[in-house]
A protein has these predicted regions:
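Loop-to-transmembrane alpha-helix entry segments
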Residues: 56-59, 75-95, 116-118, 174, ...
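Juxtamembrane helix-entry segments on the extracytoplasmic side of multipass membrane proteins
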Residues: 17-22, 98-125, 163-181, 228-238
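Specific alpha-helical transmembrane segments that line the substrate/conduction pathway
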Residues: 40-75, 203-223
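Hydrophobic alpha-helical transmembrane segments of multi-pass integral membrane proteins
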Residues: 1-11, 26, 85-91, 117-124, ...
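Hydrophobic/aromatic residues within transmembrane alpha-helices
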Residues: 42, 72-78, 139, 145, ...
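Specific transmembrane alpha-helical segments of multi-pass solute transporters/efflux pumps
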Residues: 13-53, 95, 183-201
Length: 262
């Protein structure tokens, strides 16, 4: 987060606090911090293995919630097949994250009953991120507060570290340092671009495209840590693509241009 904060500072700098809507300053920005904090605590409190995967899956409700909030609170017009598209795309996420073992509702309920806090924290993280995105559209006025968000996140995680909450430090290595540097830069730039997109772009298209996040993560993992992509991954990719295209068409913009071109 220190790397990300530095990166974001050099990209967008500090916002003009006099121009920031007070609602965005006191509610929007803290909501983004709450999302980061609750997601990290959700992963920390999970028991690992299948439960960590399921917690991540719950958190991936945020693209769907972002679109839902855009329809409810930001006046975005859509069509009925947006909702089947959301279900198909989220189903693809489940298939990708579950892997060859598949997803069992019974086992999911059992693990939730054992450790509901972790799952609820992941849900809060998803809701708050969607809320931050909606508030950015409504109150952001084109101002990008990513530097402030990351600076506060860094302080929060420093406090957690001082309280001995989190993973134990590992020995430094060239590979680890590269992961920290490139990971921090990637996360920082993602925040900057996402906030800009929420301010001025097509919310539903951006949120639908976000379903490709775990897809790209898996592809990157094959190069960075040598992970293997199984058949369930590609099946999930197909579902994500189909669902995202349905969401795109439901906005009433993308497919109109496509039909005119053809």
């Amino acid at each position: 987060y220190c790397v990300a904060t530095t990166c974001v500072f050099f990209i967008v700098g500090l916002p003009d606090f006099h121009r920031i809507d007070k609602r965005y300053l006191y509610f929007g920005i803290p909501t983004a911090n709450l999302s980061s904090l609750t997601f990290c605590l959700a992963i920390f409190t999970s028991s690992g293995g299948a439960q960590t995967m399921e917690v991540g899956m719950v958190n991936y409700l945020w693209p769907s919630l972002t679109i839902l909030f855009a329809v409810l609170f930001n006046g975005v017009r859509t069509r009925w097949w947006l909702y089947p598209g959301l279900l198909v795309a989220f189903g693809g996420i489940i298939v990708i994250l579950s892997g060859d073992k598949g997803f069992s509702v019974t086992e999911f309920v059992a693990r939730f009953a054992e450790n509901p806090v972790s799952y609820l924290l992941a849900l809060v993280a998803a809701v708050t991120w969607a809320g931050y995105s909606s508030m950015t559209r409504a109150w952001g006025k084109g101002i990008n507060p990513s530097t402030i968000i990351f600076a506060v996140d860094t302080l929060l995680f420093l406090v957690l570290w001082l309280l001995d909450i989190g993973a134990q430090p590992v020995a430094a290595s060239a590979h680890g340092l590269m992961s920290v540097i490139f990971g921090g830069i990637a996360v920082g730039m993602a925040y900057v671009v996402w906030t800009l997109g929420m301010s001025k772009g097509n919310i539903t298209v951006l949120a639908a495209a976000s379903y490709f996040t775990p897809v790209l993560s898996c592809v990157f993992a094959t190069f960075w840590i040598g992970a293997e992509l199984n058949s369930s991954f590609w099946m999930g990719v197909v579902l994500v693509v189909v669902g995202s295209l349905l969401c795109w068409d439901a906005t009433g913009r993308g497919m109109k241009k496509f039909r005119k071109a053809t």
